A protein has these predicted regions:
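Extracytoplasmic
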Residues: 613-807
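C-terminal non-catalytic alpha-helical accessory regions
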Residues: 394-402, 414-625
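Catalytic domains of carbohydrate-active enzymes, especially glycoside hydrolases
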Residues: 151-176
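Contiguous, structured surface segment used for ligand recognition
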Residues: 1-132
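Catalytic-core regions of glycoside hydrolase
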Residues: 113-115, 169, 181, 185-192, ...
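N-terminal small/glycine-rich loop or linker at the start of catalytic domains
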Residues: 125-147, 210-217
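Structural motif
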Residues: 9-15, 49-56, 92-94, 141, ...
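Active-site mouth loops of central-metabolism enzymes
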Residues: 140-154, 218-226, 368
């Protein structure tokens, strides 16, 4: 039905939210079409009408006879197109929220052009009820995230409205003093004042206000610290005008034993209820590396069913799967599990990108634009049946697509990802191009499938999008959601070009090193350096990179996202400022450059040439030996995989390809010439990782049963702990390491083989943890090595394994 000349009918009695419902409808359509719909207390020839069941007339109710009555927050729609040209579009909400969501459904499906608005007849007789009662997102005003810290109340309200249009009914805020840094240079407003104002905005949309409030005092054994924390909470709870619920993470962040955490939190909740007596409280048993008994104690405490706890949260960095959490909880809390999914990060997170190529990990980083509609729907539909719904964890606007997808699935999990993306493109970008944009949003997820150089879809999508981009309007080009999609497509294409070039440059440089005996060490080092520096001096796909940087500037102005550190004010590249890595070579640049420095200091030319030759043989173990980098696609084939991604997308119970963030930081800053002044092979940043005591097992075939072998292993986490001086017993990883059935060791000592990591590095030796392999472990020519972490369940990562014959 064409509604360009329609009247939005205003009943005599409207609540504040009902008035906002009509206002949002008119405002949104004016922005998209340029048409100002009249709001009037008298109906027109074509009327748009919004009601809720408990205050509408019998005449309106009669219009919906025979249409399924919705439940709480649900709605029904009639599209009545009469032959004489008159008509009515009537939204009847079960309640105020339902009325708003019914209006939002009209906006999502409206076909809007300049000067024209049409509501599809297919919406007639639609009845919907939200599937899950909790549907929300966390928007934290803190230095650590990559967008929200640059926002004022205006930006928060605009974004909250967008989220509400896709069914969100809750927003979670972060109080001041809950981040590593209290303030950000980007903050346009005081954190306390903004929190209070945004709570009013949330409430005005009929949504619930949540707080994420960890226990992060410096020392809770100090009564002075407790008093200060009590006073701070009183300051927050008394100031915030609306507060419906609070989530307390118990170990991320936080360092208290569950018994102490529960006791302390109970006192904080008493203060909460002085000011917000109806506020619910959820606790989340999150912990990076729980000590023995931590989870047992948590479940013992929760089994007491304290009245002040409303529910339990399934969150990132929890040891148990959601099924296990559900089974271990008392019945009282099983029906009140809140989900807190990390939709924001790509690696080192709750749901890492499956088998993510190193090239993307080094360029897009943990918080690059990460539209993952198919995977997010699959994860949602696996987890959500155990819950009341979710409030997603977000560190910026880069995960915007995932937010919308997740909330829409919470509203109705039978909706396809394709339909949600079509609505997203239609409502937020452009009706006329929505079908094509939705396809791009679906396709871009697959750019990260498998090895980057083997993914032809990256080039196909780039070519298709580039041609499409030339046809769209200026209004679309200036849309920040469109620009984020464009930037991601360009970034993936540029990454592939850069990776191909940098790998080729490394091969050229290594070929030069093989000529050291002929042309001399000084000459080949000089030439190899020149070749390797072409990665920085002559960037790959420079025209694409230039366009990416222009988009980054535009996005900083349009939505506040900080995509570089120095120019846009981002905190760091692993916190969303991923374009900071644009000059980082995607090859063994750091290893070779630092090796050259050491080789040049050798006094003997023969030794220098031999050392240069050895650089090219580093991953060549020699005849009868084996080298494996299990964090690579080839090396991962040696790893036993216990569960498929579909069974365990969070990798709680199965090994996965991972990337060492801090090694990558070192590789990045090598370009500046100061960070980690020792050679670091790129494979040290690529790991196979297991969490929470999950066994890691690797299989090697082709061993000689009569030969004697030793094994060398590089453990990146243990290495970096030792390198920065964490060598106490508590810093050791307790792990049973077995070859076959034989126990090789029961821990990873902080000093490998009794030698100081720093001294080994200073002496030019690579620090490996070495083990003798008993012949009985490979008597049939096959060796199985198994690692099982116990006691404190730290993550275990392995970067390299060498199986070497003994002399």
């Amino acid at each position: 039905m064409e509604i360009t000349s329609a009247v939005v009918y205003k009943p005599q009695l409207q609540t504040a939210l009902e008035k906002k419902t009509a206002d949002v409808f008119c405002k949104n359509l004016k922005k998209r079409s340029g048409v100002s719909l009249l709001q009037s207390k008298t109906s027109g020839k074509i009327s748009i009408e919004f009601y809720k069941e408990d205050s509408c007339s019998e005449e309106v109710k009669a219009l919906f006879d025979g249409i399924t009555v919705p439940g709480k927050e649900g709605f029904r729609i009639r599209v009545i197109d009469n032959p004489d040209g008159s008509g009515r579009i009537v939204v009847l909400g079960k309640d105020e929220r339902g009325e708003f969501y019914g209006m939002a459904r009209l906006l999502r499906k409206a076909i809007v052009k300049k000067g024209s608005i049409e509501i599809p007849d297919e919406l007639d007789s639609l009845s919907m009820t939200p599937q899950y009662p909790l549907r929300g997102h966390q928007l934290g005003y803190r230095d650590k995230n990559n967008t929200y810290g640059a926002w004022s109340k205006k930006e928060f309200e605009a974004y909250i409205e967008d989220l509400a249009l896709f069914g969100a009914n809750a927003i979670e805020l972060l109080p001041p003093k809950t981040d590593d840094r209290l303030y950000s240079a980007l903050f346009p407003e005081d954190p306390m004042e903004l929190m209070c104002e945004v709570s009013k905005i949330i409430h005005s949309y009929g949504m619930d206000v949540w707080l994420w409030y960890p226990n992060v005092g410096r020392d809770y054994h100090d009564f002075g610290c407790i008093d200060r924390e009590m006073e701070e909470r009183r300051r927050v709870f008394s100031a915030i005008p609306y507060l419906d619920a609070m989530l307390v993470p118990l170990g991320d962040p936080g360092s208290l034993w569950p018994t102490d955490a529960m006791c302390l939190t109970e006192h904080f909740v008493e203060i909460l209820h002085e000011y917000h007596p109806e506020a619910g409280v959820w606790v989340a048993p999150q912990h990076f590396q729980p000590e023995p008994g931590w989870y047992d104690t948590f479940y013992e405490e929760i089994a007491k069913e304290p009245d002040w706890i409303t529910g339990v949260c399934f969150a990132p960095w929890e040891q148990d799967s959601i099924e296990e959490l559900y089974e271990k909880l008392p019945e009282k809390y099983r029906e009140n599990i809140r989900n807190y999914p990390d939709i924001s990060h790509n690696s080192n997170c709750q749901f890492p990108v499956e088998n993510w190529d190193m090239a993307f990990a080094l360029t897009s980083g943990r918080e690059g634009y990460n539209a993952r509609p198919e995977k997010m729907k699959a994860i949602h539909n696996m987890l959500e049946p155990y819950t009341i719904g979710s409030i997603t964890y977000s560190e910026g606007i880069h995960d915007d697509v995932n937010k919308i997808l997740w909330a829409d699935q919470d509203f109705d999990s039978s909706v396809t990802a394709e339909e949600t993306m079509a609505d997203y493109a239609n409502l937020f970008i452009d009706s006329e191009t929505s079908e094509q944009v939705a396809e791009f949003l679906m396709d871009v997820e697959h750019n990260w499938d498998g090895p980057v150089l083997e993914n032809d879809g990256i080039d196909v999508l780039y070519e298709s999008f580039t041609a499409f981009d030339k046809t769209v309007s200026k209004q679309v080009k200036n849309n920040y959601r469109y620009q984020m999609l464009k930037l991601r497509i360009l970034t993936d294409y540029w990454t592939k070009q850069k990776y191909a070039k940098d790998q080729e440059l490394e091969q050229q440089a290594r070929a030069v090193l093989d000529l050291a005996d002929i042309t001399g060490s000084e000459a080949v080092i000089r030439e190899a350096r020149t070749i390797l520096n072409l990665s920085r001096d002559v960037p790959a796909a420079e025209d694409v990179l230039f366009e990416m940087l222009k988009l980054a500037d535009s996005l900083r102005n349009l939505c506040g996202i900080q995509l570089t550190e120095n120019h846009h004010g981002g905190q760091c590249w692993i916190r969303g400022a991923y374009l900071q890595t644009r000059s980082m070579p995607l090859n063994d640049y750091q290893y070779l450059m630092q090796s050259f420095k050491r080789i040049e200091k050798m006094q003997n030319e023969k030794n220098r040439c031999a050392a240069l030759h050895q650089l090219n043989l580093r991953q060549d173990p020699g005849d009868g030996n084996q080298f494996c980098a299990p964090g690579t696609y080839e090396g991962f084939s040696h790893v036993s995989v216990w569960h498929s991604w579909e069974e365990d997308p969070g990798y709680l119970k199965t090994p996965f390809i991972d990337h060492s963030v801090y090694t990558m930081v070192g590789l990045l800053h090598e370009i500046d010439g100061w960070y980690h002044e020792f050679p670091m092979p790129l494979t040290w940043a690529l790991n196979v990782t297991v969490l929470y005591g999950t066994p890691l097992e690797m299989t090697f075939t082709g061993l000689d049963p009569e030969a004697s072998y030793g094994m060398k292993v590089f453990y990146p986490n243990s290495f970096f702990r030792a390198f920065v001086g964490q060598t106490a017993l508590k810093d050791e990883t307790l792990v049973n390491i077995r070859a076959g059935k034989v126990l090789l060791a029961d821990r990873i000592a902080q000093n490998p083989n009794g030698k100081s990591v720093r001294r080994e590095i200073e002496a030019g030796r690579e620090p490996f943890w070495e083990y003798d392999l008993p012949k009985e472990s490979y008597q049939d020519g096959t060796l199985k090595v198994r690692w099982e972490v116990y006691d404190t369940l730290k993550a275990l990562a392995v970067s390299e394994v060498w199986i070497m014959k003994k002399e």
